[in-house]
Amino acid sequence: AASDVYKRQNGMVFVSGQLPIDAATGQMAEGIEGQARQSLENIKHILEEAGLTMGNIVKTTVFLQDMSLFAGMNGVYATYFDGAFPARSAVAVKALPKDALVEIECIAVR
C-alpha cells in the first residue's frame, strides 16, 4: 500500500480509510451491516495497536457506495460508541476500492 494504516501526530492518531476486509482471511464481509462491522473492527484493532480505544475517536468520515446504505451502516455504527458519538461526515461516492459498500476513516486523540 502507498500509505500507512495510521499516523501519530501531536497526540492525534489519523487512521486511514478501512475497507471491510478481514486482515486474517483477506475476505470482504457481506452486506452493508457486515461490511460496516468489519470496517469498524479494523479501526478498533488499529486504535488498540496505537494504545487507544473507540472512545478516543473525535471524528469519522464514512464513505458509502450509495446513500441508501446509510441506515444499515448507522445501525451497526451506533453499537461501537457508548452514546458519546464522534463528529461524523457521511458521503456517497461513485465507487470504492474492491467494489466495497463502505469505507471508514477516523481521527482519534489521546
Describe the function of each predicted region.
Residues T53-V58:
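Short acidic capping loops at alpha-helix termini that bridge into adjacent secondary structure
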Residues K7-L19:
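Short coil-to-beta-strand
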Residues G34-E48:
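Short, well-ordered amphipathic alpha-helical segments that serve as non-catalytic structural scaffolds
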Residues A1-Y6:
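Short, small-residue-biased leader/transition segments that mark boundaries at the very start
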